[in-house]
């Protein structure tokens, strides 16, 4: 499935239902306000390295995990 301008799809991000107009994992990371190099990502249970996020297409009902490092102790 290819997204068209203005089209939104239903996905799950970090266990919560969400909608996005992002066509790729990299676009979703940016849309959610994360710094590209500061997070780890998984799509449907599979790790997705930073270098391939821009070519990793999203589809309805995809399950995405985005993990950002935390500071503190």
Predicted regions and their residues:
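Ubiquitin-like/PB1-type beta-grasp interaction modules and other compact soluble beta-rich domains
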Residues: 1-72
